A protein has these predicted regions:
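A short helix->loop->beta-strand "cap" motif at the edges of active sites that frequently abuts
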Residues: 9-14, 33
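Extended, hydrophobic alpha-helical segments in both membrane/secreted and soluble proteins
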Residues: 1-4, 14-16, 36, 50
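Terminal connector regions
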Residues: 181-220
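Secreted, periplasmic, or luminal enzymes acting at the cell surface/secretory milieu
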Residues: 19-139, 145-147, 198, 202-205
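Intrinsically disordered, low-complexity Pro/Gly/Ser/Thr-rich segments with frequent PxxP/GP/PP motifs
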Residues: 152-187
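Short, hydrophobic/aromatic beta-strand segments
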Residues: 137-144, 156, 189-190
């Protein structure tokens, strides 16, 4: 932390690169640095990949597989529990949410379409259009979350059910289609039967668990 503060005090743009196998306290770096790059354990070619991102030769498209907490007292942080209450001086939200990640370009979401499945295994299809509205080519990770609104047993408000990583040239649009099957919508009921219960389901499509761009509902 002393090194981060010292480098930041020079007034030069600062990028902090994390090589780690778990989440770390990133509060000071998030406050002082202009960018954070989490590389995890990138392997023997990791240096080349990190350099490509830092020098702008590649637009990053990684997404967090975990939530990054603000403090130890906030643990455990589960994205599926939704927004937690603030406590004393600590916010209820994580510092960086599950599924979060930045890019050197921007993407917009539009045209959510929900249709009943036409195949025996597909119960519901979810489609939307993603457009690269930035000034350079890049990849986006489109994430589909589902919430069971009327289940017989308590369910999380949102669960990641699918995602697609797509490459779009600047100005390009593409329709992304998800096929929801039994395993995507089934739950264990109070008698431990693995069933798909009829009822209302909430659909959420976005760029992260806390960055939902499109919402809709369907009924089984």
């Amino acid at each position: 932390e002393k090194l981060i503060s010292a480098v930041a005090s020079t007034g030069k743009p600062l990028v902090v690169v994390y090589i780690q196998g778990r989440t770390m306290n990133m509060n000071l770096a998030a406050e002082k640095a202009q960018a954070l790059l989490t590389a995890w354990y990138p392997g023997e070619q990791g240096g080349m990949g990190i350099a490509d991102i830092l020098f702008g030769d590649y637009s990053p498209a990684g997404r967090l597989p975990v939530s990054v907490p603000r403090s130890e007292g906030q643990l455990p942080v589960f994205y599926s529990q939704g927004t937690q209450r603030d406590y004393v001086e600590s916010k209820g939200t994580p510092l960086y949410a599950f599924g979060y990640g930045l890019s050197y370009t921007r993407f917009t979401y539009s045209g959510l379409e929900l249709q009943k499945g036409t195949e025996m295994e597909t119960l519901q299809t979810v489609a939307c259009t993603v457009t690269n509205t930035g000034n350079r080519d890049g990849e986006e990770v489109v994430q589909l979350y589902i919430g069971d609104k009327v289940a017989s047993v308590s369910q999380p408000p949102l669960l990641l059910k699918a995602f697609q990583r797509i490459f779009l040239k600047k100005g390009e649009s593409r329709q992304v289609i998800f096929h929801l099957k039994k395993d995507d919508l089934a739950i264990y009921d109070s008698e431990m039967n693995y069933v798909v219960e009829p009822g209302e389901f909430k659909v959420m499509v976005g760029a992260a668990s806390n960055d939902i761009r499109l919402e809709g509902e369907f009924v089984l």
